[in-house]
Amino acid sequence: MATEPMTNYGYEKLCAELKNLKEVERPRIVVEIDIARSHGDLKENAEYHAAREKQAFIEARINELGLMLANAQVIDPASLPHNKVSFGSSVKILNLDTDKEFVYTLVGSMESNPSKGLISVSSPIAKALMGKSEGDEVSITLPNGENEFEILEVFYKDIVFEG
């Protein structure tokens, strides 16, 4: 698995989720399974089967988070140069076909929130913008087809994930 770039915020958020799953959710589901098991016949015990399914989901998520954290590359976007589009950069682009402007900030895939302008570095838009500078024009394939964009500005701003 390749390294996964993320901010310290993203790393801490994943650590908190992992801790919660291991220390709260996993013990809780073990108790639920024991209670369901005490109700008798396991073949037709929907409560037991639901709890086992939930346990499998929790264990899979614990494994997934463990892998993500093991492969995490924590990056402080403020420490990077932002003369070209890179991780943590904010970029203002102009759709040359529609004359609409957009501002995006490139973050890790686990931190993305497109409605807040936070897009994953692995998204098609981010991939097309990476390494480009102000004034560059890029062609990006979107669901509605090929679109031409001009990069108006590349800058750094503090990334606000919540609130």
UniProtKB/Swiss-Prot annotation:
Keyword rRNA-binding found: no
Transmembrane intervals: none
GO molecular function per UniProt: DNA binding; RNA polymerase binding
Biological function: Necessary for efficient RNA polymerase transcription elongation past template-encoded arresting sites. The arresting sites in DNA have the property of trapping a certain fraction of elongating RNA polymerases that pass through, resulting in locked ternary complexes. Cleavage of the nascent transcript by cleavage factors such as GreA or GreB allows the resumption of elongation from the new 3'terminus. GreA releases sequences of 2 to 3 nucleotides.
Domain of life: Bacteria
InterPro entries: GreA/GreB_C_sf, TF_GreA/GreB_CS, Tscrpt_elong_fac_GreA, Tscrpt_elong_fac_GreA/B, Tscrpt_elong_fac_GreA/B_C, Tscrpt_elong_fac_GreA/B_fam, Tscrpt_elong_fac_GreA/B_N, Tscrpt_elong_fac_GreA/B_N_sf
Family to which the UniProt record says this protein belongs: Belongs to the GreA/GreB family.
HAMAP family, sorted: GreA_GreB (MF_00105)
Keyword Coiled coil found: yes
Biological processes annotated in GO: DNA-templated transcription elongation; regulation of DNA-templated transcription elongation
Source organism of the structure: Helicobacter hepaticus (strain ATCC 51449 / 3B1)
Coiled coil: 45-65
Pfam family, one: GreA_GreB
Protein name listed in UniProt: Transcription elongation factor GreA
Keywords: Coiled coil, DNA-binding, Transcription, Transcription regulation
